[in-house]
């Protein structure tokens, strides 16, 4: 009887002895699971943040692609090989411009002419800029020659075509290569237009204000007042071309005078501090 009781009690006693150990094991297992879960969560978080990286990389790549496209789209600067006559004419006009403005520079060639124009554009008011250029043009040609041309070549088909042809032969050093084109004057075809595919002066400055105040306005005034020939200069600021139409009066509401300067491409403003408002 005692043996049976002992045998029956042993399993219960054994079970009772095992429960604390099992509970401890379960607790340790639970704690380890919690710890592992926490560690996994912490380790997982840094991996969640880079998920947006591809989007940023895509945006950066797109921006770089845009910049590269714009750079690739920019046309290369025209290279000019000036002859001895070109250099002589450029130096002569540059010196007259410097004397009229009182602003000297030590540069050579076309760079000297552009530097003289930049100095005028930086310092003087818009009206004064055109006045100085007109004075420089009058200095460049003796008054008796101007008077002789004005008297001997009154406005006519011949004089209009003569001025156009003369410009294409003797002034490519100033404006770049150009050619004579036809237009209709009083119902007749005349070769009175000079077409400049890319103006050298405009390309060198990339400035609308300098084009209008230091070239277009004073040249129109000088040719009409000193040579007796009406002329309308019509620049195209999209492709830097220009047309000189001899015999045509500039319109009062000239669209070129309303054109804002290039916001990001103006070399004169970005590199030389020119106020290119027109």
Curated annotation (Swiss-Prot):
GO BP terms in the entry: secondary shoot formation; strigolactone biosynthetic process
Enzyme Commission number(s): 5.2.1.14
Principal place of residence: plastid
KW Cell membrane (keyword) present? no
Q: Name one GO cellular component term.
A: chloroplast
Q: Which InterPro entries match?
A: D27-like, D27-like_C
Essential cofactor(s)? Fe cation
Extra notes?
A: Recombinant D27 protein expressed in E.coli contains about 1.7 mole of iron per mole of protein.
What does it do?
Answer: Involved in strigolactones biosynthesis by catalyzing the isomerization of the C9-C10 double bond in all-trans-beta-carotene leading to 9-cis-beta-carotene and providing the substrate for CCD7. Strigolactones are hormones that inhibit tillering and shoot branching through the MAX-dependent pathway, contribute to the regulation of shoot architectural response to phosphate-limiting conditions and function as rhizosphere signals that stimulate hyphal branching of arbuscular mycorrhizal fungi and trigger seed germination of root parasitic weeds.
Protein name in the entry: Beta-carotene isomerase D27, chloroplastic
**What organism is listed for this UniProt entry?**
Oryza sativa subsp. japonica (Rice)
Gene for this chain: D27
């Amino acid at each position: 009887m005692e043996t049976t009781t002992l045998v029956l009690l042993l399993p219960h006693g054994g079970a009772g002895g095992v429960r604390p150990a099992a509970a401890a094991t379960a607790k340790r297992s639970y704690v380890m699971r919690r710890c592992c879960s926490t560690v996994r969560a912490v380790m997982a978080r840094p991996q969640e943040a880079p998920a947006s990286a591809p989007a940023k990389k895509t945006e950066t790549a797109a921006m770089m692609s845009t910049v590269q496209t714009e750079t690739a789209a920019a046309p290369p600067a025209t290279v000019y090989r000036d002859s001895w006559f070109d250099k002589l004419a450029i130096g002569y006009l540059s010196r007259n411009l410097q004397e009229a403005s009182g602003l000297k520079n030590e540069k050579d060639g076309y760079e000297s002419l552009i530097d003289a124009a930049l100095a005028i554009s930086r310092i003087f008011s818009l009206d004064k800029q055109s006045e100085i250029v007109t004075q420089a043009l009058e200095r460049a040609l003796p008054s008796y020659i101007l008077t002789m041309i004005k008297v001997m070549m009154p406005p006519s088909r011949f004089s209009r075509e003569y001025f156009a042809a003369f410009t294409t032969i003797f002034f490519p050093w100033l404006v770049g290569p150009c050619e004579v084109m036809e237009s209709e004057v009083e119902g007749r075809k005349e070769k009175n237009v000079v077409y400049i595919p890319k103006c050298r002066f405009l390309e060198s400055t990339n400035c609308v204000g300098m084009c209008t105040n230091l070239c277009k306005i004073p040249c129109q005034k000088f040719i009409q007042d000193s040579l007796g020939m009406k002329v309308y200069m019509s620049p195209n600021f999209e492709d830097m071309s220009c047309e000189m139409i001899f015999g045509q009066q500039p319109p009062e509401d000239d669209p070129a005078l309303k054109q804002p300067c290039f916001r990001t491409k103006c070399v004169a403003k970005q590199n030389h501090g020119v106020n290119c408002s027109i």
